[in-house]
């Protein structure tokens, strides 16, 4: 796995006192079969967040872990929970909650891949598709780990399709999004907490920290270990960020076509703020003979899965999406992100541009702004302590 360790090691952390840093996976005292899975997956040595958080999760302590997008957060909690699972017991022991179906499915696959030599029984449980096949497998082989979205997981718990009495660990991935009022997951997550054993270990993972996470800390966590990236380190150093002032909204399309023609890119994601604009933009580009695919939350799950699979395997090179794709989806070859609209939620900026430059790679993020967006741009710069420069005239130099 290609990984810019030099960039990763520049990260500075604020952590709980006397926190041990493990420079190798061997020093973490992991199960042999788990180590085999880690190396087969392509990891050679732990990233900065992995070297600090995995041993804390394994120790059974509650953990709040923060790191920039693409630094191996998913593998951090996955390795921790796989180490904790008792393979002799076939009942549910670990539960992972994520804000989107795509992310929950991806995490489920990571659990299976890293746990390949352990023969762990892991399932992704999300809305939008039938559970008949998964339920048959769960009943036949047992279910030791579940990655899912809050609504579907809670529904299955209430219907007693998932038994939670032996759950040892709950992971909240992209916790700031999970707990935000806008998505409406917060009460569902609180209801899930109420169904878990009181001594259940809680791991909270997020790229940003906010008051909702602090509330969960107070209510459900016991003296958590904190592993936080210093605020000025969250600007994603490996990604060149530029702004293009288009003056008027209607000029964005022509600007996008100019960039499209000028850049040599591997893969690109274009973000819009509404589903309607995603559909409009993809139709306009297709009419202009550009090859693009699109995805948003109103599409059927089968359609979203096909779009994701085509993009992940490289069959399509340009994806237009709403923020449903901004969180944690790992496609290694994305080298360019274009914010056709600046994000309405300021924390989503880091999640969007983190789609390029995954896991320490170099990437480019281009932000289109009109006069009406200037205040929002200044807000983003202030929040992340960054300065986003105008894009140079020679587009080709970015590729």
Curated annotation (Swiss-Prot):
Its EC number is 3.6.4.13. Changing residue 246 to A: Decreases the amount of 40S ribosomal subunit. Keywords: ATP-binding, Helicase, Hydrolase, Nucleotide-binding, Nucleus, Ribosome biogenesis, RNA-binding, rRNA processing. Disulfide bonds: none annotated. It is found in: Nucleus, Nucleolus. A motif (Q motif) lies at residues 23-51. One of its GO terms (molecular function) is ATP binding. GO terms for cellular component: catalytic step 2 spliceosome; FAL1-SGD1 complex; nucleolus; preribosome, small subunit precursor; small-subunit processome. Residues 238-399 form the Helicase C-terminal domain. CDD domains: SF2_C_DEAD. Transmembrane segments: none annotated. Pfam families: DEAD (PF00270), Helicase_C (PF00271). GO terms for biological process: maturation of SSU-rRNA; maturation of SSU-rRNA from tricistronic rRNA transcript (SSU-rRNA, 5.8S rRNA, LSU-rRNA); mRNA splicing, via spliceosome. Its main location: nucleus. It catalyses: ATP + H2O = ADP + phosphate + H(+). ATP binds at residues 67-74. Residues 54-227 form the Helicase ATP-binding domain. InterPro entries: DEAD/DEAH_box_helicase_dom, Helicase_ATP-bd, Helicase_C-like, P-loop_NTPase, RNA-helicase_DEAD-box_CS, RNA_helicase_DEAD_Q_motif. A motif (DEAD box) lies at residues 173-176. SMART domains: DEXDc (SM00487), HELICc (SM00490). Changing residue 85 to T: Decreases the amount of 40S ribosomal subunit. Belongs to the DEAD box helicase family. DDX48/FAL1 subfamily. The Q motif is unique to and characteristic of the DEAD box family of RNA helicases and controls ATP binding and hydrolysis. Present with 3090 molecules/cell in log phase SD medium. ATP-dependent RNA helicase involved in 40S ribosomal subunit biogenesis. Required for the processing and cleavage of 35S pre-rRNA at sites A0, A1, and A2, leading to mature 18S rRNA. This is ATP-dependent RNA helicase FAL1. It comes from Saccharomyces cerevisiae (strain ATCC 204508 / S288c) (Baker's yeast).
């Amino acid at each position: 796995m290609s990984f810019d360790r030099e960039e990763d090691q520049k990260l500075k952390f604020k952590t709980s006192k006397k926190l041990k840093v493990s420079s190798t996976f061997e020093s973490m005292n992991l199960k042999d079969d788990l180590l085999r899975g880690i190396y087969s997956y392509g990891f050679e040595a732990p990233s900065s967040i992995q070297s600090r958080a995995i041993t804390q999760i394994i120790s059974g302590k509650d953990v709040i872990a923060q790191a920039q997008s693409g630094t191996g957060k998913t593998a951090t909690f996955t390795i921790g929970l796989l180490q904790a699972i008792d393979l002799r017991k076939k009942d549910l022991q670990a539960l992972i909650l994520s804000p989107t179906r795509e992310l929950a499915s991806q995490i489920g696959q990571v659990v299976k891949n890293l746990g390949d030599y352990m023969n762990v029984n892991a399932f992704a449980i999300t809305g939008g598709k039938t559970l008949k096949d998964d339920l048959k497998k769960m009943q036949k082989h047992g279910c030791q780990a579940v990655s899912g979205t809050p609504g579907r997981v809670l529904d299955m718990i209430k219907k007693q399709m998932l038994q939670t009495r032996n759950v040892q660990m709950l992971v909240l991935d992209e916790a700031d999004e999970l707990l935000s009022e806008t998505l409406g997951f917060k009460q569902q997550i609180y209801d899930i907490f109420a169904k878990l054993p009181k001594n259940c270990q809680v791991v909270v993972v997020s790229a940003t920290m906010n008051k909702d996470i602090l509330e969960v800390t107070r209510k459900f966590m016991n003296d958590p270990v904190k592993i936080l990236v210093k605020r000025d380190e969250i600007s994603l150093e490996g990604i060149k960020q530029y702004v293009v002032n288009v003056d008027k909204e209607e000029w964005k399309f022509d600007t996008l076509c100019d960039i499209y023609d000028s850049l040599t890119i591997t893969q690109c994601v274009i973000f819009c703020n509404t589903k309607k604009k995603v559909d409009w933009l993809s139709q306009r580009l297709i009419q202009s003979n550009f090859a693009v695919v699109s995805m948003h939350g109103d599409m059927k799950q089968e359609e979203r899965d096909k779009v994701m699979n085509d993009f992940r395997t490289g069959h399509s090179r340009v994806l237009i999406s709403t923020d449903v794709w901004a969180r944690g989806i790992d496609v290694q070859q994305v080298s360019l992100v274009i914010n056709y609209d600046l994000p309405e939620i300021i924390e989503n900026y880091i999640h969007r541009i983190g789609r390029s430059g995954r896991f320490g790679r170099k990437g480019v993020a281009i932000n289109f702004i009109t006069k009406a967006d200037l205040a929002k741009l200044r807000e983003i710069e202030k929040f992340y302590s960054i300065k986003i420069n105008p894009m140079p005239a020679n587009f080709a130099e970015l590729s």
